[in-house]
């Protein structure tokens, strides 16, 4: 008995015992037939599982993967036909995926599978191994990636309970996981409702229904006001004077019908409303270990910029990119490729460069950056933009399209009120979304359930009394 098992043995109740997987199962590896021989795969009828088949797989049992092999492929490789009830355990890339064979099947060399002896339930071993990833990794070795050898797979510890107790433990775990899955489903419904509510808030904002319009307030108070058309005209005239005859008039031609706007609002292009509309580099500068962050579409989040997962470029390359698109606090970024959108207001002084990201430089006299962010997230703008995106396999918004984006422009003081009310309502939504996201798919909670049920089963408690908190 190993030192670990000797220490643990004292914690087990009567009838239980610590052992290893090698004592309760035959440990079987897998293999891959030669892929250059079509006879190994064509019209194969032997299910053949790889670790990729278990990536994202949430069922307990598996009957087949993406590929089948032939009997010739099975016989000519180190793959073996495993009986139904075999517990499959990935031993590399990554370690720790688990499933039970629903029917006879084979695996590639990324598995150490356990063909169990009598007296041990596959489901009991399945749940124990679901919580044994760290134990397995501690026994693994390798430089490029960790791999659990067959010899070390045999050393994996497991507490064995009497058969009836195994059945009770399995039933308790599955009851708790069923409750957890129901809770997760409810949380997903909550998130979907929050998303719809957020869209409704943004639509109400750009429909002029979220706050009293400036036109309404002016009538109520018996005063005049600067409507959006006057505001835009004043700003554009100021730019013309400043440019001294060199001002290039923005394109104001929209394609497709646009909805009617509230009194005092006007349709304008992004190029009219903003000081400038540019984009980041489309090249890929050389990456460095430590340097200036290069922000791409995937780094734009609802609540800011994800600097934790950016690549870095040299200071010299940053200066070169900044000649085209220098980012400053108060600018609005917009993903141009892949998941187009995710508008984000820059709220940091930290220097960074952008790649495949649109850059809207605000003109606070005309358009508040926070209002622009909300408008670019609105269902109205998204519906206008979606059919105009370019590309087939991967959609993208070219710079010209970003400059033409229609903006529902309210009077300037009305923008402030809209932003304040949208932020107030969406701050509550964001708090709920963060809470829901933290719970959905919580691996820690699932691990805690496994640990708690096995702990209570080995201690003075009963597994039937274990509850999710």
State each model region's role.
Residues 125, 133, 166-169, 372, ...:
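Interdomain signal-transducing alpha-helices
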Residues 2-32, 155, 159, 163-170, ...:
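Non-catalytic DNA-recognition/assembly elements of restriction-modification systems
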Residues 50-52, 66-130, 149, 296-297, ...:
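A short beta-sheet element
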Residues 2-5, 14, 91, 105-112, ...:
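A short glycine-rich beta-alpha junction/loop motif
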Residues 55-68, 299-313, 347-348:
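Short, basic/aromatic beta-hairpin or loop at an interaction surface
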Residues 190, 197-248, 461-465:
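Extended, domain-scale alpha-helical bundle/helix-rich regions
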Residues 3-9, 15-60, 73-77, 241-244, ...:
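Low-complexity, Lys/Gly-biased intrinsically disordered segments
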């Amino acid at each position: 008995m190993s030192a670990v098992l000797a220490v643990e043995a004292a914690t087990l109740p009567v009838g239980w015992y610590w052992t290893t997987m090698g004592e309760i199962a035959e440990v079987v590896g897998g293999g891959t037939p030669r892929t250059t021989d079509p006879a190994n795969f064509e019209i194969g009828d032997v299910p053949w599982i790889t670790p990729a088949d278990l990536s994202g797989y949430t069922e307990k049992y598996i009957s087949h993967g993406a590929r089948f092999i032939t009997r010739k492929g099975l016989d000519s490789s180190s793959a073996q036909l495993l009986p139904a009830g075999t517990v499959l355990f990935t031993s590399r890339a990554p370690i720790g995926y688990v499933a039970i064979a629903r029917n006879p099947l084979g695996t590639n060399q990324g598995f150490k599978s356990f063909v169990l002896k009598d007296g041990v339930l596959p489901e009991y071993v399945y749940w124990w191994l679901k919580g044994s990833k760290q134990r397995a990794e501690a026994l693994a070795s390798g430089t490029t990636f960790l791999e659990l050898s067959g010899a070390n797979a045999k050393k994996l510890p497991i507490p064995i309970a009497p058969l009836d107790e195994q059945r009770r433990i399995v039933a308790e775990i599955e009851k708790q996981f069923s409750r957890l899955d129901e809770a997760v489903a409810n949380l997903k419904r909550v998130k979907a409702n929050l998303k719809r509510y957020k869209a409704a808030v943004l639509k109400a904002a750009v429909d002029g229904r979220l706050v009293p319009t400036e036109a309404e307030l002016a009538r109520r108070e018996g005063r005049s006001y600067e409507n959006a058309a006057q505001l835009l005209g004043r700003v554009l005239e100021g730019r013309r004077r400043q440019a001294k005859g060199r001002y290039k008039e923005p394109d104001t031609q929209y394609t497709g019908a646009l909805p009617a706007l509230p009194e005092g609002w006007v349709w304008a292009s992004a190029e009219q409303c903003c000081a400038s509309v540019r984009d980041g580099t489309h090249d890929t500068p050389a990456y460095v270990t430590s340097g200036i962050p290069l922000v791409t579409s995937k780094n734009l989040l609802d609540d800011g910029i994800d600097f934790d997962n950016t690549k870095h470029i040299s200071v010299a390359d940053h200066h070169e990119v900044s000649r085209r698109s220098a980012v400053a606090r108060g600018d609005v970024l917009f993903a141009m490729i892949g998941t187009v959108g995710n508008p984000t207001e820059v709220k940091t002084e930290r220097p960074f460069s952008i790649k495949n990201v649109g850059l809207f430089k605000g003109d606070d006299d005309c358009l508040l950056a926070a209002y622009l962010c909300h408008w670019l997230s609105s269902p109205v703008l998204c519906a206008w933009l979606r059919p105009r995106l370019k590309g087939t396999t991967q959609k993208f918004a070219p710079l010209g399209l970003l400059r033409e984006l229609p903006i529902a422009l309210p009077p300037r003081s009305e923008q402030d009120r809209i932003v304040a009310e949208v932020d107030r309502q969406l701050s509550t939504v964001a708090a709920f979304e963060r809470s829901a996201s933290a719970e959905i798919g919580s691996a820690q909670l699932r691990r805690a359930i496994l640990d708690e049920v096995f702990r209570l089963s080995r201690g003075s408690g009963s597994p039937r009394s274990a509850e999710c908190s």
